[in-house]
């Protein structure tokens, strides 16, 4: 009997169906000599600090740095039952071999190995490495299973990444949170991303616009522009000279240019385009793509490749033929598919580019939600564009001389629409306009030496423009390219984060209060500015990630030492703690809320502030919190107002009128007491004579 372990339940179900394991059990499928189960993502993770020492529950500078000598693991909250299922299956006497069917890549390897180690399993295991959930891909993968131990170096690379992130995250977060009296989440990827937002916002806010002038010359149906002029008097002089002179075309340059078809989508490119065209957040795009993948309509979405392999050319051309028949906007379009530009075995590591599946050709759009339809259309259109002919046009640059000054005008004329025809048709079908689209300007017939009498000149006043605020589209691009020049070509990961994690990083910055969305824009908050300002460059620069990826790539290849890498991380962490041992009193107040305290915490004496959903103690080490939706007040049909909270904190009691009695169905007036016993929840009780 073989036990197959997938990363997610939906993937496990798909594999079970292909293998004929059709008997549904609790947490797994069985049949045809197979048991098929799943991990529910990261089922096992590195244990938190308190697991090593109970005193670490309280954050104290004297305990830093926290460096485990014997790393421990823990089952993720809410996933204990599934781990128990896997452990029991691994130790079943009739199971002779295990197949690691988790996602093909560094993290997928880590997910399986953590479960394998935590279950103390010693049985041999093999590796399933596939990029599509189609039946044919699964069957082919099982006929070519790899030796699981041949991926040991990849696992060591993944393990080092996890431990290093734990060490830096735990210690840096505690260190700066202790110093500044506020929980400040610090991470190797999150912090440099925040810094990019801060730097861009600062560049915008500190930008000083400068006025300049441009003279437009209208001659023979052509509008040519002068160079930028900072002096208005010079512009007036140019205008006056031109209006008295004859204009002459002194130079006419025509150049045929070709724009190659676009590459296929990896996840980041798909997220960027979906944000630009539809306003989808990166997380929304990932969620929609994952749902389509689980429906077998889309190939694996968390890929960082924009290419396919040579053995996929025939099947991909069949896809293209099917799409031309399926998609209404392709009716009447003649497409001679050429996949040469997107076929490169060397640029496909874990997974190939995102593609529609053969299953999609059968199912179509009928069962899809609007958001899924939009995303699926983008993927289909990108494949068709990638296989189409290049876009060809003639670029024309004319120089017009007049009154001793020169003016330039540029235009272009399309010679062959190529892939742009498909892009335009797909955009029109979805009624979406690409704001970044380059408009076509066709110039009237011109010739060198051609003269124009009575030209008109006009001065326009313009201003220099500040940089644009980041959108998720442009931030994803910046994350993808950050530190690339310092990262080796063959590194598994480049830039900040991965195709799969960048969306989560953006969401974390927003939920932690360090950034916010304003329309499509991503803007840092005041706390975001302050956090970026107080942290050392080693934590705010992408360089750390670049250095790590260089080392982790070496470990995955077996050319670098995991022990040496971890030793360097421990030294860096210890150096941070030693360097930042104390700060001034003024700096310690950087993150103090601007609003007034509503009272004093009855447990620790710190200030209590009002939040959106609660009244909470400002000392993060104290667990005192009063929830606005507390059942005590809901049952009595009273709103837990700020005035009530103030009175309870000041006097320990408050008189409230018109409380509802669930026993009598009537209202009454009474005194509510703050009956705090120091536990997880704050209690209240009524003490009064009912009227």
Model-derived regions: residue spans:
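Intrinsically disordered, low-complexity regulatory segments
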Residues: 1-162, 166, 466
């Amino acid at each position: 009997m073989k036990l197959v372990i997938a990363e997610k339940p939906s993937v496990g179900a798909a594999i079970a169906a292909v293998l004929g394991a059709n008997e549904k059990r609790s947490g797994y499928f069985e049949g045809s000599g197979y048991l098929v189960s799943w991990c529910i993502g990261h089922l096992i993770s590195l244990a938190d600090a308190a697991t090593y020492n109970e005193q670490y529950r309280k954050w104290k500078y004297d305990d830093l740095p926290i460096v485990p000598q014997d790393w421990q693991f823990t089952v993720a909250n809410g996933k204990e039952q599934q781990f128990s299922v896997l452990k029991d299956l691994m130790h079943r006497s009739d199971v002779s071999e295990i197949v690691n069917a988790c996602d093909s890549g560094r993290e997928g390897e880590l997910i399986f190995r953590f479960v394998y180690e935590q279950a103390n399993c010693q049985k041999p295991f093999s590796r399933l490495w596939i990029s599509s959930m189609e039946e044919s891909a699964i069957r082919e993968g099982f006929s070519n299973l790899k030796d699981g131990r041949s991926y040991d170096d990849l696992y060591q690379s993944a393990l080092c990444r996890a431990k290093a992130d734990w060490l830096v995250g735990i210690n840096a977060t505690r260190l700066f949170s202790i110093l500044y009296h506020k929980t400040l989440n610090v991470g190797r990827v999150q912090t440099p991303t925040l810094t990019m937002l801060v730097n861009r916002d600062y560049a915008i806010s500190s930008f000083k616009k400068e006025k300049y002038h441009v003279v437009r010359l209208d001659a023979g149906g052509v509008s040519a522009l002068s160079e930028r002029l900072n002096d208005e008097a010079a512009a007036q002089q140019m205008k006056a000279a031109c209006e008295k002179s004859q204009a002459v075309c002194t130079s006419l340059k025509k150049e045929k240019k070709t724009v190659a078809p676009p590459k296929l989508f990896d996840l980041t490119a798909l997220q960027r385009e979906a944000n630009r065209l539809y306003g989808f957040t990166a997380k929304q795009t990932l969620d929609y793509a994952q749902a389509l993948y689980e429906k077998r309509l889309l190939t694996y979405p968390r890929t960082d490749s924009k290419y396919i392999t040579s053995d996929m050319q025939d099947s991909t051309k069949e896809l293209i033929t099917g799409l031309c028949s399926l998609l209404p906007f392709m009716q009447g379009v003649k497409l001679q598919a050429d996949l040469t530009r997107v076929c490169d075995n060397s640029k496909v590591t874990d997974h190939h580019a995102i593609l529609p599946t053969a299953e999609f050709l059968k199912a179509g759009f009928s069962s899809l939600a609007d958001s899924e339809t939009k995303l699926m259309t983008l993927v289909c259109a990108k494949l068709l564009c990638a296989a189409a002919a290049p876009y060809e046009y003639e670029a024309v640059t004319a120089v017009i001389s007049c009154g001793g000054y020169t003016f330039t005008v540029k235009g272009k004329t399309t010679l062959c629409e190529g892939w742009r025809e498909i892009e335009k048709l797909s955009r029109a079908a979805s009624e979406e306009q690409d704001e970044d689209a380059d408009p076509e300007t066709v110039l009237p017939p011109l010739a060198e030496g051609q003269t124009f009498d009575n030209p008109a000149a006009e001065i326009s006043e313009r201003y220099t423009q500040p940089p644009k605020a980041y959108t998720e589209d442009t931030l994803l691009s910046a994350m993808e390219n950050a530190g690339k020049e310092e990262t080796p070509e063959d590194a598994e990961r480049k830039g900040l984060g991965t195709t799969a994690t960048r969306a989560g990083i953006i969401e974390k910055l927003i939920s932690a209060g360090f950034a916010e969305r304003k329309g499509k824009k991503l803007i840092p908050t005041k706390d975001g500015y302050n956090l970026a300002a107080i942290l050392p460059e080693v934590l705010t620069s992408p360089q750390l990630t670049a250095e790590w990826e260089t080392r982790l790539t070496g470990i995955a290849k077996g050319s670098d030492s995991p022990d040496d890498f971890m030793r360097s991380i421990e030294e860096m962490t210890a150096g941070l703690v030693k360097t930042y041992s104390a700060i001034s009193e003024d700096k310690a107040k950087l993150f103090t809320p601007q609003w007034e305290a509503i009272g004093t915490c009855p447990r620790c004496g710190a200030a209590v502030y009002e939040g959106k959903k609660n009244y909470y103690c400002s000392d993060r080490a104290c667990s005192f919190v009063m929830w606005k939706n507390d059942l005590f007040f809901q049952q009595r049909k009273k709103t837990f107002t700020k005035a009530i909270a103030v009175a309870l904190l000041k006097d320990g009691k408050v008189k409230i009128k018109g409380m509802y009695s669930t026993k009598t169905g009537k209202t009454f007036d009474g005194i509510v007491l703050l009956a705090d016993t120091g536990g997880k929840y704050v209690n209240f009780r009524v003490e009064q004579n009912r009227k």
